[in-house]
Structure formats: structure tokens, C-alpha cells
From Swiss-Prot:
Protein name in the entry: Protein translocase subunit SecA
Regions of compositional bias (Low complexity) in chain numbering: 870-885
The species this protein was found in: Rhodococcus erythropolis (strain PR4 / NBRC 100887)
Function as written in the Swiss-Prot or TrEMBL entry: Part of the Sec protein translocase complex. Interacts with the SecYEG preprotein conducting channel. Has a central role in coupling the hydrolysis of ATP to the transfer of proteins into and across the cell membrane, serving as an ATP-driven molecular motor driving the stepwise translocation of polypeptide chains across the membrane.
GO terms assigned for molecular function: ATP binding; protein-exporting ATPase activity
Amino acid sequence: MPSLSLSKLLRVGEGRMVKRLKHIAEHVESLSPDVEGLTDEQLKAKTTEFRERYAAGETLDELLPEAFSVAREASWRVIDQKHFHVQIMGGAALHFGNVAEMKTGEGKTLTCVLPAYLNAIAGDGVHVVTVNDYLAKRDSEWMGRVHRALGLETSVILSGMTPAERRVAYAADITYGTNNEFGFDYLRDNMTHSLDDLVQRGHAFAIVDEVDSILIDEARTPLIISGPADGSSKWYSEFARIAPLLKKDVHYEVDIRKRTIGVHEAGVELVEDQLGIDNLYEAANSPLVSYLNNAIKAKELYTKDKDYIVRDGEVIIVDEFTGRVLVGRRYNEGMHQAIEAKEKVEIKAENQTLATITLQNYFRLYDKLSGMTGTAETEAAELHQTYTLGVIPIPTNRPMVRVDNGDLIYKTEEAKFDAVVDDVVERHENGQPVLIGTTSVERSEYLSKQFTKRGVAHNVLNAKFHEKEATIIAEAGRSGAVTVATNMAGRGTDVVLGGNPDIIADIALRKKGLDPVTTPDEYEAAWDAVLDEVKAEVKADAEKVRDAGGLYVLGTERHESRRIDNQLRGRSGRQGDPGESRFYLSLGDELMRRFNGSALESIMTRLNLPDDVPIEAKMVSKAIKSAQTQVEQQNFEIRKNVLKYDEVMNQQRTVIYKERRQILEGEDMEGQVEQMITDVVTAYVDGATAEGYVEDWDLEQLWTALKTLYPVGIDHKTLAGEDGAGINSDLSRDDLRTALLEDAHAAYKKREAEIDAIAGENGMRELERRVFLSVLDRKWREHLYEMDYLKEGIGLRAMAQRDPLVEYQREGYDMFIGMLDGLKEESVGFLFNLQVEAAPAQPASGISVTAGSAAAASATAPKPLPTQEAAARTTGTAAPTALRAKGLDDEGPSRLTYTGPDEDGKAKATRDSAADSGDGAASRRERREAARTQSKSNRAPKSKRKR
């Protein structure tokens, strides 16, 4: 981690902040007598009063003492829990935008109620972020009981929910969910084509539970939404069939040295004849050009058993320098698929990034960010550097009396586990509950078999079934209980001595068919009686457990992160209870092997110690701590590197998403279109007149290029004054530019009148919005693809003594500017040349898009029907008559892949459930039909078409 001096520096003023929080807590507690005298209805009415006062100008800071006091009283009445002094301090720390470091068992979930309630008063929505769906659902239901009693709505975002359900959930005052769900919803919102389809309503305030896990461990893996880069594998097969019919130097030419190909006129005609289309280069068929080029490259430039081999039905690349096969590597831009088609093996879909963001940059979107954890002190410097979050250690409610024993190190893993089993059996017989932490599922199952052999009843948790694990962890503090769990399992649930009465009571009520969401009144009515009954049961057992020494936590291996070890230890000794912890290690453990375990082994061998005799030495503990620090430093560097590269993308993403949102919100695009026309026509003219005098300019070629952009209304011969005597040499570049700009703007006015005649008033404005969205999305997807490609190879720049990051920033910027120029050019071309016709009125938007449309196959987010809430948010302006616009991207749903971190911080990919309603690249017959009905002027090319 960053240097100790920085960590110490960050803690300057910490004591002052803790004192301030103590004063706030005392003030809140002093208001208790006032709120205790209020009826339930009067307590609920306080929320409306606070909102009125906030609207009148009072700040949330000024409302804090009263609001906290009201929420505290509601918690006591509804769930029989009242915030301790230290929990009020923690709540205030969260409100002020800090990380509250509260030890395990100090009630972080209850603490969160206070700042969530206070900030919900502002009406902008509060997001509470947890590590898994189960905890999000549980906390939403559990703490939602308190918020509902105060007149607030709570909701939860779960994987598998529809966009309509998500929209309703985000409209609630307080929304619970996982970091992945919040992040993916943000990305999907920036892929949608209608305001009605947006689900989130801003990023005002977030409270991140287990902040170290989410903002540190999981931040190494970015969130990525990807989809098929091309529509269908059938086009690869089709062109693999056509390629052998094409003859070198007759239909195409090849430059072996540059590894490029060029298709001749004869080749284009043969392809058009084979596909039954009129023009390969018009908009309907433009995606087919890349299929053709790749098929010829696969035939001429990629040789079997030299550039690649085919093994077990799979095309595998061969490294041209070493001759080694590169398993898992694939060529980009559809080249690998073209080779697969050539070799007649299975064609695997190419996935393309459609949207991506790191967790660091997602959480930086929030106006105010805060978090809770039991172990943040070791990461204080990183939290401050990345998120400008301060870490405030909150005192424990009662003094910690847990005994943390020194590590025991064994020579072999087998000897270690034998000692673990012996220790657990002895404590189990004494009635002491034991929680055993392992680092893998295999080790959990191995221990389970050993306990079964010894006749010890036990439970095994592997962090897969969260609902089941909460139940088991809730009972892990009962007399004689033995629980084996991976280190990450059971987070968010307290191990209470004698059993967790709240969880046990909740389970009992659910067995009777009652829950706090679907049957809130019946649940609340039955709650007190069931809770009292359970408390009486666990009280006697809790005393037996205390007499036996409290919960014994046994770690079977050190984790590479000190925080994970501390979290495991922290399960014992909550709220001043007695407890004990110890780690059993062996020289075969991963951390020991990685960091000089051999030196320790030689010492143990020289001492001639038997395998089953451990050593306990401070030297070993120090070495382990040093090893953990090194691993943490490595992981910090990885996260820092991910963030540095994403900063480049983040600036570009911010520009694109801002522009996109303005288009969605109905900003008048007329002025922007006029500027685009000016920029594009100027670029055409400047390119054609860059060199020489008027006699040297190829005005014929310029006019040909301009005619593909818009219907040119003036003749270049007339403008240049050409006659029998030659060209008028007085024509300047400025005169030419001015004349063409006047002509282009006049043509656009005429075009606007045509569209308005079909669609009515504002029809052109709606068409502009649809065209801009379609082209912007496609260009952005292509840009992400190119940026991915750039990043893959940028590390090689270091060999040329260049900083890869600086090179990535420079080239990424150049590519972004190029993308924006292409965006203008294509948009202008589409606006002038799109074929439009009247269509049946659409309920959601003014212009519909034909299926099997001509642009490149697109992958966009599933488009739900607007809910009533979304409908209420729409502007209500009269939509123009519906138009059918040929050549725009189809907005149909595509199967998307979502890649994000799991609870261990490793990348995990999931697929959505969108129906495959049609192929992005239509069938051959459909393509032919679309092509025949398509105008040759649909395409918006960059320059004169070259064959």
C-alpha cells in the first residue's frame, strides 16, 4: 500500500472529527424525550415536515439531529432496536461523506438507516450498495420496515428484473442493490433510444456497505456490456463460398508486403451477381464489404499450418516469431471468423464492447459517496486517493475482550488439518461454538469429511447459497455449533452468542407465510410476540456459550489480504462478548510458498521437529504480514493502472453520454445540424483544394463526392466559368466554399420541407434526433472496439522507450476526434439521403425503424414498454406523424453479455434473457429484397466510391 507517512498524514484531524461526531450523537440523544411522546402518526408526519422545511431552505445538516432522532425512535418501535451512541456517530460520519470504520457486530446495517432517511428527505434518491443480491433484498425488507413506518418507499434492484420493474425501484426514496446492478443500469441507460426507457434518475448519494470489498477488491475488474460485433455467421460462410470463384489479378489484387487487398470492378460485379443485389456499395449492403475483404484476406494472406493450425475443429493462431500455438487468442475485426468459414469449422461469434466503465469512475458520479466496513484502516490511503473518502474509526459500543492467539505453523498441510480437527473436537465437547474459515471449497469439504469421521455435527458454507448461509450463520453462535465456511461466506450476518434472534424470528414468520413486503401488516402484528419467544430461547443458551469462552474463530490459512483475515477474526467478540481466535498455517499454504516458505522449512528441518509439532514465532508472523503487504501493494498498482487507462475513456465517455442525453431530452438539433453541414462541406472543399491553383483542382471528383452527401444544386463548370477558353482562374477557395455552403444549406431547407410535408410540423427535428442517436451509437461502438484494439498492443511501445500510457492518451484522443468527424459526415449524409415514408402511428416515438434495415448490425439494450411512472415523466409534446426511415439501425433486442466482478473480485460473465427476435444481418433473401428497394443514394460515404 502507499507509504506509511501518507497513511499517518491522512489521520491528522481524525480526533477532531470523532469529537464532532460525539457532540452530534449527544445532541440527537437529548431529543429522545421529545420524539418518544409522539404517536406513530405524528412520527410519520415528521417526514413531511422535514421535506417542507428542506424545500423552504433548511439544509440537511441543520435537519440532521431531529431527523436522526425520529429515525432512531422508529427503529425502536418497529424492529425493537435503538441506535447506540456509536451508531449515531457512524450515521453522521456517513452523512458527511466518509467511510465509517465499525467493527463486525457493531450494527452497520442499522447505522445505515439514519443517513439514508435524512438524505431521502431531499427527494433525489438514496442508493445503498451491498455485496450480493441476498443482502440487498434482506436489508431492503428489514430496514424498509423502519422507512415505511416513516412514510418512505424502499425498493431493491435484483438481477433478472425487467427494465419496467427497475424504473419503479429507482423511483423509490431508498434503493438497495449490488454494485454490478447499479453500474450496468447506468450503462444500459446510455444505450437506450427513448427517455421512457431510462431507469435511473441521477446519482445523488450512495452508501456502500462493505466498502473495502466493493471499492477496493472488486475495482480491479471493470463493468463491460458486450454483444455480437456482427449479425450472423451465415455471411462468413457465404463469402467463403464466393472467395474461390474470385481470381487473383482479375477480380482483385494483393499486396503481400503490406498485407492488403483491393477489389477490382470485375470482382464487385461477380459478387453482386452471386448475391443477387444491384449495388454492393449502397447503404443496405455496406456491411457486406468487410465480409468480402476478410474472405479474400483469409484466402490469400493467411496460410494453414503457417499462420494458423486447425485442431479439434478450432482455428488456433501460430506465433510468427516463435512458432508456438497461441491457444485462446483470436484475430480481431471478423478475420478469425473468416478463416473459420474458409476451413469449414464452427464459426464462433465475435463479441464487441458496447459500453464499459470501471467501478471507480461509476462511484465518482455520485454527488456524495460514503461507506461502511469493519476493516478500512489498511486501505485508507487508497480510498482517499481514488475517491477522496476519509476513513473515520468509530469506537466500539463496549470494550473488545477477544483473545487473539499467535499463529501455529506446521510442516505439512495434513498435520495442520489433523491439529485443527483435534482442537475443534475438544472445544465442541466443551459446548463452545466454533467458526472455521478456509480459503477454498475443496478445503471446506476436506474438513467436513474429517468431522464426519469423528462424529461431529457441523454445517458447511461455500458462499454460493446466500439465503441458506444467513440462516446457518445466524445459528453459528449456539452452544457446540461447528460451522465450516470459506472466508468470504456469511458476510453481513452477525454471529450472535446463543443465536441471532432477529434472523431466527424472521425465518419463523416466513414459514407461516408472512413477510415484510407482501404482508407487512400481519408481519408487524406477529413480530413482537415471536421475537420475545425467540429471545427467551437464546438467552439461556447465550449464557452457556459465554461460560465456555464465547465464539472460537479458527483460520486454516492466511489470506493475501490482511482485511479478510481481520474480517474473519472480527466475527468473534462482538458487542463486548468473550471470544478467541487463532490461525493454523502450514509451509504448503499459498502465501507461505509465495514468500520464502523454504527458509522456514529448512529451520524446522534443522531443529528436527516432527510434522505434528508446530512452531509459534513472532518472526513468522512478521514475515506473513510483510508478504501480505507486498500482495496488497501489487493489487493496488493493478487497480491504479486500470484507473489510469480508464481515465482516458472516461473523458470521452462523459462527452458522448452528455451529448446523448441532450438528444434524448429533446434538445433542438437544428443549429447543430447547420454547423455540421458547414464543417463537413468545408472539409470536402479544403481537401479538394489543398494543393495547387484552380487549374489543378479536380472539381469533377469533388462534385462526385458531394453528390453522395447531398443533392448539389450548382454546376462546377458554371461556377468555375469553364468555356472554350478554359477555366476562370479568378475562382478562389473561399468563393468555392461559400457557394457550396449556401447551396448545401438551401438544400437542407428544401429537405426539411419535404419531411415536414410527410410528418407534419417538427418531423425533421424528430428525424434529426433519431439519426443522431443511431449514428452516435454505432460510431461509439466502433470507437470502443478500436480503443480495445489499441490497448491490447500499447504495452509494446515501452520497447521503443515510450510511455504506453502517454501513447494511449495521445492516440486515443486522435481516434476520438476522428470518430467525431465521421459522426458529422455520416449524420449529414443520412439526413439528406434517408428514404422516408408515412407509417402507422407508433405509441412510443415519432419515427419507427424498419426491420432488417440497411445499416451495420447493431446491439442495443432491450427496450421495455414504458411504465405508468415513466409515462408521467414524458414531456407531453405532440409527436409528429410516424415515419418509416430506411437505413437506420434496428433497435430490436440482442443478447448481451455482462462482465463484472464477483464477490472475490474476479471477472464473471452473465448473459441477459432478451429474446433473439431476429437476426441483425437478415437472411440472404431478405437482404436482396432490402437492397433492391433501397436507393443508391442512401449511403453516406466519406469520399468518392472507389472499387
